[in-house]
UniProtKB/Swiss-Prot annotation:
This is Probable glucose-1-phosphate cytidylyltransferase. Mg(2+) binds at residues 127, 232. Its cofactor is Mg(2+). Substrate binds at residues 6-13, 23, 103, 108, 126. InterPro entries: G1P_cyt_trans-like, NTP_transferase_dom, Nucleotide-diphossugar_trans. Belongs to the glucose-1-phosphate cytidylyltransferase family. GO terms for biological process: biosynthetic process.
Length: 254
């Protein structure tokens, strides 16, 4: 199963960092947010990733192209140029898709269609962390038999709010400020989801696609009661770094 990660946003609410790098490369404990997300997936056996790039996407490519030699001990034979890595390399296979700087999220996901094929896949945002059990999430999706499953979080937030009955979304409203179950990312999606994406891609996945999935009874909601956070502002970034430095890395399931 592949994990698709949305990495293209401009991160305007975190300009202290994102003037120079894309938000998924903002550091937590010396490693990018994106690295932490990928390690969560890796712990549950997901090693194939599709990164949907946009703003400063080349920085994400550079990070991973340089990753092994920067983060591992190595032996260099200067006479032959041969390099031997001494550490344990990551077993990731990463596809970097340039999806456009201003492309909306539905359009970014649509561009991944040819790389996903006819299999169920995982999707999340490049700024969200959770100690979610992906085995349970995937099993729940299979049990419900819906086209899509979203992780639902109990939180007062600026994120999308779901009305849920018997584990299925009845309505989806993006970015309200009321109490409720919010969109926590960490989706499981069947290829049927692509039928809900406009061919021009000119919309947010969190707008008409999710609303229509809910209306058609095709959006299941997996309730996660553990740790979850979205690193939406510089203050959020400082908070999770404080947690990391104090040994409270509750999302560190690996």
């Amino acid at each position: 199963m592949k994990a698709v990660i949305l990495c293209g946003g401009k991160g305007t609410r975190m300009s202290e960092v994102t003037n120079d790098i894309p938000k998924p490369l903002a550091m937590i404990g010396g490693k990018p947010i994106l690295w932490h997300i990928m390690k969560i997936y890796q712990y549950y056996g997901v090693n194939e990733f599709i990164l949907l790039l946009g703003y400063k996407g080349e920085k994400i490519k550079e990070y991973f192209l340089d990753y092994e030699w920067k983060h591992n001990s190595l032996t260099l034979d200067s006479s032959t140029g041969e390099v031997q890595m001494l550490g344990q390399p990551e077993t990731w296979k990463i596809t970097f898709l340039e999806t456009g700087v201003d492309t909306l999220t539905a359009g970014r996901i649509l561009q991944a269609k040819d790389y996903i094929g006819d299999e169920t896949f995982l999707l999340t945002y490049g700024d969200g962390l959770a100690n979610i059990n992906l085995f349970h999430l995937i099993s729940y999706h299979q049990t419900k038999g819906a086209a899509a499953t979203v992780t639902g979080i109990d939180k007062v937030s600026q994120f999308g709010t779901l009305t849920v009955e018997d584990g299925m979304a009845k309505t989806f409203s993006e970015k309200t400020s009321s109490d409720g179950i919010i969109n926590g990312g960490f989706f499981v999606l069947s290829p049927k989801v692509f039928d809900y994406l406009p061919k021009d891609g000119n919309t947010m996945f969190e707008d008409e696609p999710l609303k229509n999935l809910a209306k058609d009874g095709e959006l299941a909601v997996y309730r996660h009661y553990g740790f979850w956070t979205a690193i939406d502002t510089y203050k959020n970034l400082l908070e999770v770094n404080k947690m990391w430095n104090q040994g409270q890395q509750v999302w560190k399931v690996w």
